[in-house]
């Protein structure tokens, strides 16, 4: 089982790299908390056990993993920075699910992620009591996420791409639509 800290560091590192390439704004503590919740939820739904053992609580702005919140609280609303990238104690299966969740939810604003976690009937909404920071039961998270549309896996995305019509050169390489070649007779349609 992974540690919440490894999950958080992995997500921070992924979004830091995307931000360096102008593909993301970076990770704030509030955004991290919401993404931790979604990752835990989808992992529970898919594997019937938690990705990490640390509790998730219902705070004013949505689900929070307190140990992770405290670790990064010094950043306030600023972009999180962590130590230099390290090896993460995560399996390839865990990393893949985290990447799939980031692919689905990482594109949304923090405000929208907060709204999603506040959906009526969602685990946060069932236990939230202002100022109480009540624990959100793992079983309720699992039940809720089993009713949600599954995140597309990397494997499914590759399969979807492979089913599209494209040209393949005689040597087997794929010719993408924007490629232009003078002698199309050398190529076969797949």
What are these regions (language model features)?
Residues 1-190:
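Domain-edge interaction signal
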């Amino acid at each position: 089982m992974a540690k919440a800290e490894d999950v958080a560091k992995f997500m921070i590192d992924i979004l830091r790299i995307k931000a360096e390439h102008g593909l993301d704004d970076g990770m704030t503590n509030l955004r991290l908390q919401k993404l931790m919740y979604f990752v835990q939820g989808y992992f529970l739904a898919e594997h019937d056990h938690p990705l990490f053992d640390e509790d998730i609580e219902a705070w004013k702005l949505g689900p929070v993993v307190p140990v992770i919140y405290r670790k990064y609280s010094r950043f306030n609303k600023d972009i999180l920075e962590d130590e230099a990238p390290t090896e993460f104690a995560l399996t390839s299966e865990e990393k893949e699910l985290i990447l799939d969740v980031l692919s689905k939810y990482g594109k949304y604003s923090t405000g929208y992620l907060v709204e999603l976690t506040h959906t009526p009937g969602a685990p946060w909404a069932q236990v939230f009591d202002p100022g109480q920071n009540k624990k959100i039961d793992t079983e309720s998270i699992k039940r809720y996420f089993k009713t949600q549309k599954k995140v597309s896996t990397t494997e499914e995305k590759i399969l979807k791409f492979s089913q599209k019509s494209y040209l393949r050169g005689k040597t087997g390489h794929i010719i993408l639509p924007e490629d232009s070649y003078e002698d199309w007779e050398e190529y076969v349609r797949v």
